[in-house]
């Protein structure tokens, strides 16, 4: 058998992939950047009576792999499936796909806005975990970042204070989950979390101890920021271009302002459109 080469833009088939999705890099190729658009609404999936919720969850996850702008969330506490997407059109497409591919007739409840949380001032959080025969302590610096930066993690800790292996473990625990804020429990964003200090015990420290200490340090830092009014709730917003006839520009501007929007000065095109 000989190797087969494809040029950029050509379509080919690859076997043996188990966790591939749009944007995944193969071999030396890096994964593509995150989608520019992120879901802004969340809906609860209402399954038919008697339907297997876990089987439905698996089917939704398969569709999620095909569509990067669809996020499927399993709420273990409530035993509910939630989908996060852009709006009603995508919702109708999802409903149609589930019916056509899997014969699954689902409904969705009224959607809710996907808020996020951040901080407005740098603060330090400390997490201490010391039950019997366990020990770990983590000091984190939480800093705000410009809008659209997402979450960033780093370490600035001396090895004399905390061994490099433990430092890497703390970073792993920071990156492995979606951290939630303390205002409404929304996901954190636009924040840098840096490991600045930590302690371990030669005899009693185990890997799971640093997971607990790390999560507690994040939480404690957020609680401290909230006490001094340095936490902030973020809501999604849209940037778009609106083209209307010149005689309708006043009404359009009034409607945008009425919905708490803002706009740049209007521009008139040669055909009279504004």
Q: What is the predicted function of each stretch?
A:
Residues 2-274:
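Accessory interaction regions appended to the cores of large information-processing enzymes
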């Amino acid at each position: 058998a000989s190797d087969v080469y494809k040029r950029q833009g050509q379509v080919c088939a690859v076997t043996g992939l188990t966790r591939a999705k749009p944007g995944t890099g193969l071999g030396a190729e890096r994964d593509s950047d995150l989608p520019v658009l992120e879901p802004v609404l969340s809906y609860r999936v209402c399954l038919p009576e008697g339907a297997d919720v876990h089987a439905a969850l698996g089917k939704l996850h398969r569709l999620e792999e095909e569509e990067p702008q669809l996020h499927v969330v399993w709420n273990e506490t409530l035993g509910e499936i939630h989908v996060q997407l852009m709006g009603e059109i995508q919702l109708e497409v999802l409903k149609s796909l589930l019916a056509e591919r899997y014969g699954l007739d689902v409904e969705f409840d009224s959607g809710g806005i996907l808020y996020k949380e951040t901080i407005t001032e740098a603060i330090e959080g400390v997490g201490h975990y010391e039950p019997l025969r366990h020990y770990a302590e983590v000091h984190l610096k939480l800093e705000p970042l410009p809008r659209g930066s997402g979450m960033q993690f780093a370490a600035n800790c001396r090895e004399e204070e905390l061994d490099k292996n433990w430092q890497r473990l703390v970073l792993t625990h920071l990156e492995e989950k979606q951290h939630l804020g303390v205002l409404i429990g929304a996901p954190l964003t636009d924040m840098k979390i840096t490991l600045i200090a930590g302690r371990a015990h030669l005899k009693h420290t185990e890997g799971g101890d640093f997971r607990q200490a790390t999560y507690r340090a994040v939480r404690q830092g957020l609680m401290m920021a909230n006490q001094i009014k340095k936490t902030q709730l973020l809501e999604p917003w849209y940037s778009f271009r609106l083209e209307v006839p010149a005689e309708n520009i006043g009404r359009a501007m009034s409607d945008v302002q009425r919905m708490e929007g803002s706009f740049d000065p209007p521009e008139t095109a040669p055909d009279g459109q504004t």
